[in-house]
A protein has these predicted regions:
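Mid/C-terminal beta-alpha module of Rossmann-like enzyme folds, strongest
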Residues: 50-52, 58-98, 103-104
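Short aromatic/basic micro-patch
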Residues: 8, 43, 72, 101-102, ...
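Glycine-rich Rossmann NAD(P)(H)-binding loop
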Residues: 14-17, 34-40, 65-73, 94-96, ...
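Amphipathic terminal alpha-helices
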Residues: 105, 117-128
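Generic structural signal for alpha-helix termini and adjacent loop/cap motifs
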Residues: 30, 56-59, 110, 128
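NAD(P)-dependent short-chain dehydrogenase/reductase
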Residues: 1-42, 46-47
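Amphipathic alpha-helical segment in the mid-to-C-terminal domain
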Residues: 21, 46, 75, 114-118
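Short, amphipathic alpha-helical "lid/cap" segments that border enzyme active or binding sites
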Residues: 24, 46-54, 119-123
Length: 128
């Protein structure tokens, strides 16, 4: 059990331009995905993760704190942005949650907001 004066950050789906090639973002980026799912994910860029850590560390916030972009994005929509909207949909995915969107209200209450939206980044072919 964590001490009462501790904080734990619960990150959603973290990504970056050099994300692992065997994760969905990397598979789509590298045009190696063979399917998509009907899941929705709260994609947070690693730069926003670092920003969240810097914001939260000096505060007195305790307990578990969800950290994400705060937006639920369908995996299929991300595939479309990567030009792979025609991939087959894998329906049966045991052990996967349908949606992992984070309630980022605690982070926003200390002045933090995420700034890198995955759909804008992919659409603009940017590497923040």
């Amino acid at each position: 059990m964590a001490p009462p004066n501790s904080v734990g950050m619960r990150f959603t789906t973290v990504y970056a331009p050099d994300s692992r090639d065997n994760m969905m973002y990397g598979l789509l980026r590298d045009k190696k995905a063979t399917y998509v799912t009907n899941h929705r994910r709260d994609w947070i860029h690693v730069h926003d993760v670092c920003s969240a850590i810097r914001f939260l560390a000096p505060t007195t916030v305790t307990g578990p704190v969800p950290v994400g972009y705060g937006e639920s994005v369908p995996v299929r929509k991300l595939a479309e942005k990567f030009g792979q909207g025609d991939l087959p949909v894998k329906e049966f995915t045991p052990g996967e949650v349908d949606d992992n969107v984070a309630d980022i209200s605690v982070m926003m209450s200390i002045g933090w907001i995420p700034v890198i939206n995955i759909l804008d980044t992919v659409q603009n072919n940017e590497d923040p």
